[in-house]
Amino acid sequence: MADVTLSRTGQVSRKTNETAVSVSVNIDGTGVSKIATGVGFFDHMLDQLARHSLIDMEIKTEGDLHVDDHHTVEDTGIAIGQAIAKALGDRRGITRYASLDLAMDETMTRAAVDVSGRPFLVWNVTFSSPKIGTFDTELVREFFQALAQHAGITLHVQNIYGANNHHVAETCFKSVARVLRTATEIDPRQAGRVPSTKGTLA
């Protein structure tokens, strides 16, 4: 039987009239990241995503920031999702499901994921301010929508409570990171099988 843990890496380069994005990921990494999107707060969040998922990420985005951050954030999410999907391949042997409540000071956020091959986002997060510094808070959802769609995952994110918008955003990234870490891990009891009675995840 083939080693399902062999080379779980993915690389994507994506260029449009609005952005140029290059992403490489290693699902079986240690959370090392090299990130440059031109958007400081977003870089900080992506660093959290890599660190707590233990997925190594190298991300370089050049976007039309003279317009706003939207295209940069969304297209980076698309490319990360595509790279993760490539790295997972047919998803053979993975744990598949995970959920977690994550605390950060006064904030609690819940994330649940099914690495199913079927993209869907349920988003129950509200920010009390339209911006964190200069970053539009609505872009947090846009990022996760792009990630879920292109990684082929069903993702639920719910902020249970929290007063600080930075903490709310950060717990979204950290909780999603932790469930991705668990759900994409190889389960030795699966013995290399696809974790579905259908025999495929699509």
From Swiss-Prot:
Q: Name one GO molecular function term.
A: imidazoleglycerol-phosphate dehydratase activity
Q: Where, per UniProt, does this protein localize? A: Cytoplasm
Q: In which pathway does it act?
A: Amino-acid biosynthesis; L-histidine biosynthesis; L-histidine from 5-phospho-alpha-D-ribose 1-diphosphate: step 6/9
Q: Does the keyword Metal-binding apply?
A: no
Which BP terms does GO give this entry?
Answer: L-histidine biosynthetic process
* A Pfam family recorded for this sequence: IGPD
Reactions catalysed, semicolon-separated, are: D-erythro-1-(imidazol-4-yl)glycerol 3-phosphate = 3-(imidazol-4-yl)-2-oxopropyl phosphate + H2O
Output the Gene Ontology cellular-component terms.
cytoplasm
**What InterPro entries does UniProt report for this protein, alphabetically?**
IGPD_sf (IPR038494), ImidazoleglycerolP_deHydtase (IPR000807), ImidazoleglycerP_deHydtase_CS (IPR020565), Ribosomal_Su5_D2-typ_SF (IPR020568)
Q: Which family does it belong to?
A: Belongs to the imidazoleglycerol-phosphate dehydratase family.
Quote the PANTHER family the UniProt record gives.
Answer: IMIDAZOLEGLYCEROL-PHOSPHATE DEHYDRATASE, IMIDAZOLEGLYCEROL-PHOSPHATE DEHYDRATASE HIS7
Instruction: Quote the protein name from its UniProt record.
Output: Imidazoleglycerol-phosphate dehydratase
Q: What organism is recorded for this protein?
A: Sinorhizobium fredii (strain NBRC 101917 / NGR234)
Species classification: Bacteria, Pseudomonadati, Pseudomonadota, Alphaproteobacteria, Hyphomicrobiales
Record gene name: hisB
